[in-house]
Regions:
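N-terminal, active-site-proximal structural segment of metallo-dependent hydrolase catalytic domains
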Residues: 1-92
Length: 94
């Protein structure tokens, strides 16, 4: 079993979009079964999205939060779907 953990620093990094492309390529190559990320960010300026429309998203009871359009996890999942990879995932705002 392959497990991947990463502190993404997501939107705080320079060239965040380019780094996401590289990261999604690594995930495509390695295809881990389980992934855990820290510092999965989103800006406060983006509009909220309907979580029911986000691919593979599974809410956690008692930890509901408003997901925004530039949420790093949601964006990464979109990139992975383009590569034919599907993951169930959740996001807990802290």
């Amino acid at each position: 079993m392959k497990i991947l953990t990463l502190n993404t620093h997501s939107l705080a990094e320079e060239n965040a979009a380019e780094k996401m492309q590289l990261f999604s390529g690594i995930i495509e190559q390695e295809q881990p079964e389980i992934m855990a990320f820290q510092e999965v960010n989103q800006t406060m300026a983006e509009p909220f999205i309907n979580e029911k429309e986000v691919s593979g998203y599974q809410p956690v009871n008692g930890h509901e939060g408003k997901m925004r359009r530039d949420n790093y996890a949601a964006s990464l999942v979109d990139e992975l779907r383009k590569k034919g990879l599907f993951y169930y995932w959740t996001w807990i705002p802290v």
